[in-house]
Amino acid sequence: MIRVIIERHQKEAKKGELIHLLRELRASAINQPGYVSGESLASIDDASIVSVLSTWQSLIDWRNWAKSETRAKLEKQIEPLLTEKPKVSIYQVMATE
């Protein structure tokens, strides 16, 4: 299982638009093979930062979603709402036992 964290820095006046598109992105991801869960997080220290944490069964599942046409279309709409390119970090879930 893997977790993907995508950190986005939004433009000041674009928060509502970004949140709407992130909801659309998650609604589309739910239908993807291997998708487990996702949530959006707002930084307490910097109001311009919105991060999305998603969990996938495998790296292959994430990569298939990452290169999908559906995701690309939504990311293209999100891009102008940001001050910089999103930072994507991928983590392997470690055994905790």
Regions inferred by a protein language model and the residue ranges of each:
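Short amphipathic alpha-helical/adjacent loop interface patches that line ligand
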Residues: 22, 26, 75
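An amphipathic, aromatic/His-enriched active-site/gating alpha helix that lines ligand/cofactor pockets
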Residues: 30-37, 55-89
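Short, well-ordered beta-strand segments in beta-rich or mixed alpha/beta enzyme
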Residues: 2-8, 39-66
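Glycine-rich beta-strand-turn "strand-cap" elements at beta-sheet edges
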Residues: 2, 39-46, 76-97
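Short, surface-exposed ligand-recognition loops at beta-strand->loop->(often short) alpha-helix junctions
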Residues: 9-18
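Conserved GNAT-fold acetyl-CoA-binding loop/helix
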Residues: 19, 23, 70
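Short, flexible segments with low predicted structural confidence
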Residues: 1-2, 17, 33-35, 45
